Amino acid sequence: MPSYVCLIQFKDQGIRNIQDTVKRGDAAMAEAKKMGMKIVEEYWTMGAYDGVVIMEAPDDETMSAFILKVGSLGNVKGQTLRAFRRNEMEGILAKIK
C-alpha cells in the first residue's frame, strides 16, 4: 500500500481538549482500519508540528477521504505527504533514464 506522512497541528478545539488526544488517536486508528488503511505509527512532537503520523492507504482517494473526515472534527489540521519507499523510488528513477 502507498505510504503517507501526516504533519499535524492542533487547532484551538484540539488544545482545549488536549486530555483526549490519545483517545482521539485510538479513534483515528479504528476509523482508518474501517477504511482499509493502517496507521503505522503516531508521534506527538515538539516544534512547528504537534504530531507526525505514518500511514498506509490503498490509494490517494481513500487517504484524502480519511484526512477530510478527521479534519472535519475540528481538532487538528495538517499536511499530508505521499512517501515513496526505496523500491518505489528506484522504479521512478528507472523511468527517467
Label each residue range with its predicted role.
Residues 36-39, 75-77:
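A generic structural signal for alpha->beta connector loops
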Residues 57-87:
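An amphipathic, aromatic/His-enriched active-site/gating alpha helix that lines ligand/cofactor pockets
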